């Protein structure tokens, strides 16, 4: 890897230099060729293993942990920071630079009495979900590798430590801006320095002046809305949408007790610490805006309040438009720009409202009838929209409700000239395979009990091609067995 050190060299006082501690008996549990290509790597090798397990120093690495704060479950915590993630620097790839971080690399000044380690189960889950979301075209950080060890660590019981090698276009979070806004007591120098750095590194088309700051925040609002629209469309629940877990680039990261929906449930909670359902699946769009408002507050020294409010007011529209774009592709609705006759803005808005109503009625039917979200949407790839019968009806208990919806659906889709092509388009928009919690758990158990990572590798391969039939992997598309239904994870890692 070839590193540059822009954050380390230009933002002194925004981090603490700290060196990772090695893990014993390191071994590859998983490796992503796709992620490796992003930073110009090819195959894993023994020397790289020793570098990424902190047994050898990586040439050109600086090793540091960033400081930030954040709102956690709605309450402000004035000092957080990287408690178990140590950044090596920005690795230069063929199409840009990516931060390389060792998640589980050991204690830092921000560990808050923790050991700075990650347990194998959380490292494996982060590796797999990074692969899964990337293949689903959801904006996300990546995981280059997961490295196992025989180093014991204590959580509720003894487990083994592991390291996830995370790649991110940036590790700058909403919480970075909160920290320097609240801790500098009205001195905007460091806040301005951070905004300028963020723009120069990641928004180079913008200027570092009042006009540039205004446009930058608008683009942050837009990218956040787009990310969450993607989450809602694929049934992804993040679980811990604290502001310190929000990327300034609108990429998904900081994976903890996440889950994909099995049975559709608007109020699904995947984090057993979320007693009030603050971060429930259906709450995510609203929390995205709440978090953006916390970010906007920090920017008041450099951006006019009216401009911040104007940008925030675009969030809901952008979220809905992105969600509509994705759901129309899933259900086979023509996009407004595909219409043979141009329609004006008022007609587009009316069509959008009707489409949202149809989508909401469908998800309502899925919830009422306790149906699997992913499998139900995949059925549209076998549907002839001109046929009076839909196989989706066979799963319904509320037949009258479905029939009413289906008639409206057929009217919206209209006549389809080439049914086979239409079905292929639906299959390219609706995945057959997702990372179900029980599948990840089976891979983890195989490693824990037998040191066998074959299930992990099989699952990784499957998730890299979620839209393909992969008929030999059919069992992975089934609804969870009884023991795997509604698994709720903890933040313990």
Curated annotation (Swiss-Prot):
Residues at the catalytic site: 244 (proton acceptor)
EC number: 2.7.7.-, 2.7.7.108
Entry function: Nucleotidyltransferase involved in the post-translational modification of proteins. It can catalyze the addition of adenosine monophosphate (AMP) or uridine monophosphate (UMP) to a protein, resulting in modifications known as AMPylation and UMPylation.
Parts of the chain that traverse the membrane: none
Coiled coil: none
Keyword Transmembrane helix applies: no
Reactions it catalyzes: L-seryl-[protein] + ATP = 3-O-(5'-adenylyl)-L-seryl-[protein] + diphosphate; L-threonyl-[protein] + ATP = 3-O-(5'-adenylyl)-L-threonyl-[protein] + diphosphate; L-tyrosyl-[protein] + ATP = O-(5'-adenylyl)-L-tyrosyl-[protein] + diphosphate; L-histidyl-[protein] + UTP = N(tele)-(5'-uridylyl)-L-histidyl-[protein] + diphosphate
Homology family: Belongs to the SELO family.
Domain of life: Bacteria
Cofactor needs: Mg(2+); Mn(2+)
Binding-site residues, ATP: 81, 83-84, 103, 115-116, 166, 173, 254
One GO molecular-function entry: ATP binding
Pfam family, any one: SelO
Top-rank EC class of the record's enzyme: transferase
Keywords in alphabetical order: ATP-binding, Magnesium, Manganese, Metal-binding, Nucleotide-binding, Nucleotidyltransferase, Transferase
Annotated InterPro entries: SelO
Protein name in UniProt: Protein nucleotidyltransferase YdiU
Binding locations of Mg(2+): 245, 254
């Amino acid at each position: 890897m070839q590193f540059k050190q822009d954050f380390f060299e230009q933002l002194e006082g925004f981090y603490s230099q700290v060196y990772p501690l090695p893990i014993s008996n390191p071994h590859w549990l998983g490796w992503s060729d796709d992620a490796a290509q992003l930073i110009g790597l090819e195959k894993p090798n023994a020397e790289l293993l020793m570098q990424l397990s902190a047994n050898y120093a990586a040439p050109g690495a600086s090793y540091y942990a960033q400081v930030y704060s954040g709102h956690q479950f709605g309450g402000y915590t004035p000092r957080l920071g990287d408690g178990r993630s140590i950044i090596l620097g920005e690795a230069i790839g063929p199409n840009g630079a990516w931060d390389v971080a060792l998640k589980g690399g050991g204690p830092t000044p921000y560990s808050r009495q923790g050991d700075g380690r990650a347990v194998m189960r959380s490292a494996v889950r982060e590796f797999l979900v990074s692969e899964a979301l990337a293949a689903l075209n959801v904006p996300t950080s990546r995981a280059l590798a997961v490295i196992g060890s025989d180093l014991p660590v204590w959580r509720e019981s003894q487990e083994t430590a592991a390291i996830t090698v995370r790649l991110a276009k940036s590790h700058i979070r909403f919480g970075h801006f909160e920290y320097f806004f609240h801790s500098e007591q009205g001195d905007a120098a460091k806040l301005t320095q951070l905004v300028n750095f963020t723009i120069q590194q990641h928004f180079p088309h913008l200027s570092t002046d009042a006009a540039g700051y205004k446009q930058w925040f608008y683009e942050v609002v837009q990218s956040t809305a787009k990310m969450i629209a993607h989450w809602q469309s694929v049934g992804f629940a993040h679980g811990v949408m604290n502001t310190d877990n929000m990327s300034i680039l609108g990429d998904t990261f900081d994976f903890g007790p996440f889950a994909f929906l099995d049975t559709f449930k608007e109020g699904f909670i995947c984090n057993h610490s979320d007693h009030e359902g603050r971060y429930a699946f259906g709450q995510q769009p609203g929390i995205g805006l709440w978090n953006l408002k916390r970010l906007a507050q920090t920017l008041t020294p450099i951006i006019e309040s009216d401009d911040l409010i104007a940008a925030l007011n675009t969030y809901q529209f952008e979220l809905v438009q992105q969600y509509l774009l994705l759901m129309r592709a899933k259900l086979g609705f023509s996009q407004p720009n595909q219409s043979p006759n141009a329609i004006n803005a008022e007609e587009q808005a009316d069509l959008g409202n009707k489409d949202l109503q149809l989508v909401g009625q469908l998800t309502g039917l899925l919830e009422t009838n306790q149906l699997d979200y992913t499998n139900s949407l995949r059925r549209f790839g076998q549907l002839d929209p001109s046929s009076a019968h839909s196989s989706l009806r066979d799963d319904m208990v509320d037949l009258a409700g479905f029939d009413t919806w289906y008639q409206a659906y057929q009217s919206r889709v209209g006549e389809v000239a080439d049914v086979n092509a239409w079905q292929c388009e639906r299959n390219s928009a609706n995945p057959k395979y997702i990372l179900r919690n029980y599948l990840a758990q089976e891979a983890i158990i195989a490693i824990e009990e037998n040191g066998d990572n074959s299930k992990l590798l099989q699952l990784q391969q499957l998730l890299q091609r979620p839209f393909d039939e992969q008929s030999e992997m059919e069992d992975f598309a089934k609804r969870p067995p009884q023991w795997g239904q509604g698994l709720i994870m903890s933040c313990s890692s």
